[in-house]
Amino acid sequence: LWLPDGQPRLMLQISHGMTEHSGRYDTLAAALAEHGIACAAFDLRGHGRNPGSRTCADMGPDGWEQSLSDLQRFCERLRESFPGVPLGMLGFSLGSFLLRDALCRGMAAPAGVILAGTGTQPGAVLAVIQAIVRGQLRRAKPGGTTPLVQKLSFGAYNRKFAPNRTRADWLCADKEALDRYCADPLCRPDISAALFLELLSAMRRTGGKRALAGWNRCPILLLSGADDPVGAMGSGVRQLGAAMERAGLPVQTVLLPGARHDIFHEEAGGAAAQARSRILCFCETILAESEKPRNQSPAEK
């Protein structure tokens, strides 16, 4: 929990990405706290300080559904602890798909949403990968992975930046930040076959235009690196933004030039600073919208 001096103007709940942990958002949260914005985060199941393998991120049996419940309960506690303070939500990478799934189900009802490092892929492509991963799941140990699963997940992203210096070059071009990530004992190097399959399922559920029908009508920011393979080097993010616009959702789409996936740690080139600035500006948008009278007509807004 990161609190500003005095009463928070906004609470921003943060859901972190695959294989990492909530502590990696300290710089972002501290910067927002200087402007009266509180931040709160927790380690997702099988991540960070939670029990489980230290080499393979795995949420356990029914882990995705349990994680959605965790997110719902966490938001409820934040609302109880900070009554009257608008609640915004930020999801990065894995966290963005978890948040999107929650919103598709009408959960959380945030005052504003930030989806960072997200994207969309054709359902047919995801279905093929799912079928392959199901076969690999039978070969993998419980909570474990296989070489093919790694090749289909992180390996596919890393190949776009060959020749590779590390297993995670796709995350960012900032070598110092990348080395800190690889050396962080709370960051798992691999993803389990089971978690990858659950992620693929969530991507299919949240990718169709019908999925947007249940979303809360609140300000939305899509924020990604222009060179992020998860967002298909920007095209997948733009497609998602266009789909949201067609669904009548108030969305802003921002692609940071030269930045890869992990925009919050891409300090070299200034992408991380730009990301913090964009999020701060968007938080002001959330606050402005939340202060409007609820009985205002669309024309008056």
Where would I find each of the regions flagged by the language model?
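Active-site glycine-rich loops that stabilize anionic/oxyanionic intermediates
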Residues: 16-20, 93, 226-227
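Conserved alpha/beta-hydrolase
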Residues: 29-54
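Alpha/beta-hydrolase active-site loop
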Residues: 60-79
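Alpha/beta-hydrolase fold nucleophile elbow
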Residues: 82-93
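Alpha/beta-hydrolase-fold enzymes
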Residues: 99-186
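Short beta-strand/loop motif that positions the catalytic acidic residue
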Residues: 222-224
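Conserved alpha/beta-hydrolase "acid-adjacent" motif
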Residues: 229-239
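Catalytic active-site module of serine/aspartate enzymes centered on a nucleophile-bearing elbow/loop
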Residues: 247-301
